[in-house]
């Protein structure tokens, strides 16, 4: 889990646009962010395997 202070800090509007860093909306993780879903790769995988993200399923070929 991310530090609570970092999560709160990222929710505030930053002074400059380049200072903004995307964070997972579920756990607050700053790395591995998937922009389309607003989640990090770990949370995305958990929710996708549970079937909670509509239109997403595990690929197989």
From Swiss-Prot:
An annotated Gene Ontology molecular function: rRNA binding
Cofactor: Zn(2+)
Entries under Gene3D superfamilies matching the protein: 30s Ribosomal Protein S14, Chain N
GO cellular component: cytoplasm; small ribosomal subunit
Pfam assignment, any one: Ribosomal_S14
Domain of life of the source: Bacteria
Biological process, per Gene Ontology: translation
Cofactor binding, note field: Binds 1 zinc ion per subunit.
Keywords from the named record: Metal-binding, Ribonucleoprotein, Ribosomal protein, RNA-binding, rRNA-binding, Zinc
Keyword flag Zinc: yes
Positions contributing to Zn(2+) binding: 24, 27, 40, 43
Function per UniProt: Binds 16S rRNA, required for the assembly of 30S particles and may also be responsible for determining the conformation of the 16S rRNA at the A site.
Record's subunit section: Part of the 30S ribosomal subunit. Contacts proteins S3 and S10.
Protein name per Swiss-Prot or TrEMBL: Small ribosomal subunit protein uS14
Species classification: Bacteria, Bacillati, Chloroflexota, Dehalococcoidia, Dehalococcoidales
């Amino acid at each position: 889990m991310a530090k609570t202070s970092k999560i709160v800090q990222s929710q505030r509007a930053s002074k400059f646009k380049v200072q903004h860093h995307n964070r997972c909306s579920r756990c607050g993780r700053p790395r591995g962010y998937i922009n389309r879903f607003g989640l990090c790769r770990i949370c995305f995988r958990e929710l996708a395997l549970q079937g909670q993200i509509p239109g997403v399923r595990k690929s197989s070929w």
